[in-house]
A protein has these predicted regions:
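PLP-dependent class I/II
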Residues: 1-287
């Protein structure tokens, strides 16, 4: 969905902006269109988009902005205030450069939000938005690549974008998911898996990490948490964690230095068993 959406709104030589940290596959998706991915530097520790830098980086060649909320790897949910200002910047820059800048919103974790909060819809803030969604997260169907692209009414080219993406899918060799999965998911539009387990797991990890002195932003959704590593080299920190049977992902993968991603899309008992290992890992850096 993301690859098709980007291809539909860009031409070779165009620029696509995204915010660090970001899902690493964005790079190949954009490169495959002949466009260039430019990455807005992160704004730690909150990891809300760095809108001051964003405003400065938008140029005449910018035709698309790619966002991900709730965010992988941080778990951060972009606030309504953030989305309002982002929309204002996009509107202003579109007028200045004489062409609309599209917003592609990657939202596979939309249903996984904590504290009873609702995730703001980026499309509600900016008209030229294409929304990408996947059922693999909310229905716990990892590996089943089934989702959609929704073009907001009023978006430039709304009459042709959907047809364009259907043809892009054919020409790039992307096949439809098996029909039995499509039919099954079609009957599950109003349900999700038990997503409360993710919030339980998040609270266990967040409480333990903060108690151990890690610098970490509390996730607002997803099933990831993104603490700062206890040394500058995140790769070295991940190798150290393996000595305690902890498998972490270094933040270099996501365009940021010095952090690690922990995934907690596992049963709660396994999360509980990991807590003593985190204690041992932290203790190893206090020696």
């Amino acid at each position: 969905a993301i690859a098709h959406a980007i291809r539909a709104v860009t031409q070779p030589g165009d620029e696509v902006l995204t915010f660090a940290p970001y899902f690493p596959e964005y790079g190949p998706y954009v490169a495959g269109t002949g466009a260039v991915l430019r990455v807005v530097p992160p704004q730690a520790p909150t990891f809300q988009p760095n809108l001051d830098a964003f405003e400065q980086m938008i140029g005449e060649k910018t035709t698309c902005v790619l966002i991900n909320t709730p965010n992988n790897p941080t778990g951060v949910v972009y606030s309504a205030q953030t989305l309002t200002r982002m929309a204002d910047i996009l509107t202003e820059k579109s007028k200045a450069f004489g062409h609309n800048i599209f917003l592609v919103s990657d939202e596979p974790y939309r249903d996984i939000a904590f504290d009873g909060k609702k995730v703001p819809y980026p499309a509600a803030f900016y008209p030229h938005t294409l929304t990408c969604f996947s059922y693999s997260k909310s229905l716990s169907l990892p590996g089943e690549r089934l989702g959609y692209v929704a073009v907001r009414p009023g978006c430039e080219g709304e009459d042709i974008l959907v047809d364009m993406m259907a043809q892009i899918s054919r020409f790039t060799g992307h096949n439809c998911p098996p029909s039995i999965i499509q039919r099954a998911v079609g009957r599950c539009q109003e349900v999700t898996s038990d997503l409360s387990v993710y919030e339980t797991n998040m609270n266990l990890l967040y409480d333990k990490l903060t108690a151990l002195g890690f610098e970490v932003e509390r996730p607002g959704g997803t099933f990831y948490i993104f603490p700062k590593a206890l040394e500058e080299d995140a790769n070295a920190f991940c190798l150290k964690a393996r000595e305690f049977d902890l498998l972490l992902v270094p933040s270099d993968t996501f365009g940021v230095k010095g952090y690690v991603r922990l995934a907690y899309c596992i049963d709660t008992e396994k999360v509980k068993r990991s807590l003593p290992a985190l204690e041992k890992l932290a203790a190893a850096y206090r020696k």
